Amino acid sequence: NGWRYGAPIIPGEVTLNDLYNIIPMNPPISTVELIGEEIVAMLEENLERTFARDPYDQMGGYVKRSLGFNAYIKIENPPGQRVQEVFVGDEPLQTGRYYPTTFVTEQGVAGKYGRNRRHHTERSIEALKTYLSRYSPLRAELRGTFVAV
């Protein structure tokens, strides 16, 4: 999970300014183990805050950016019934299994979720710079993380 600030980055060199536009406060990288049912609960919570029928219940206005899973959702369904199926890689999410998760700030994973929460010394900007040095040039393809069905 990451932040949503800044405009999309156009193809070409990614600058330090671009990185700070993505995640301006440069928080530390955190990890936590989430059980499958917590992942579904978090997704349902986020979808309700995004697509609530009552506009006064809407908060944030976006579905969190995520990577590493695919969720098939019915936006029009009532709260708690939007997530239809989740896959981690090619495997269906197992509600009783723990999954290692990486995030930044409690906006990514609220403190009520998970076990073995750790805040690491590496900070977000340094992690992004390391990633870019390994995987440039980048290709940003749609991954179908959230699919409305």
What are these regions (language model features)?
Residues 1-149:
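Catalytic centers of hydrolytic enzymes
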